[in-house]
Amino acid sequence: MPRFDIVGQLGSLRRYARSLTRDSADAEDLVHDALVRAYERRGTFRSGGNLRAWLLSIVHNAFIDKMRSRRSEAARVEQAGYLTDASTPAPQEHSVRLAQVREAFFSLPEEQRSALHLVAIEGLSYQEAADASGVPLGTLMSRIGRARAALRGMESAAPAPAKNHLRIVGDPS
């Protein structure tokens, strides 16, 4: 039985779970459930296999199972309402831009958000991400393409930065 470096994978698992659930508490629950499943199914892990990809696929499958068990679409819509931050972001332009990117990312459909997260944030190859998601490679690639196109569309639809219409009055010397 191989030894697992689960602790070294927790950051990736938490980020991916947060990306899927859009809620920190739900993400922690999802990671916990996935780790319990991984422990129970540790015999199915192939020696020499990619532990991170295996664990991420368990997180993904646990998320899908959780979504299937929810009673109605209304419960998911209500859950998404908790995304808004109660705190006001810092006024710096970078902070505002980061909040806009985060909002755009979380507005993507779950399948696109999941695919983009695995490749762009977790750094998995397309094949590893497809395996973790349980979809064919072509499906994953088109989901990523649609996600990127949607984000580009949101970028072009964003209002242009405000121009300074103030006039300097007085002697410039």
What spans do the regions from the language model cover?
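A short pre-motif secondary-structure segment
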Residues: 115-119
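Short, aromatic/basic-enriched loop-to-helix "N-cap" motif that marks the start
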Residues: 11, 43-57, 137
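A short, charge-rich alpha-helical start-of-domain segment used by transcription regulators
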Residues: 1-15, 25-28, 39
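Short, small-hydrophobic-rich alpha-helical interface motif
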Residues: 13, 27-38, 58, 129, ...
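DNA-recognition helix of helix-turn-helix
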Residues: 133-160
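Arg/Lys-rich amphipathic alpha helix in sigma70-family domain 2
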Residues: 46, 57-78, 93-94, 153
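Σ70-family region 2.3-2.4 aromatic/basic alpha-helix that recognizes the −10 promoter
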Residues: 35-39, 49-69, 144, 148
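Acidic, proline/glycine-rich intrinsically disordered inter-domain spacer in sigma factors
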Residues: 4, 74-106
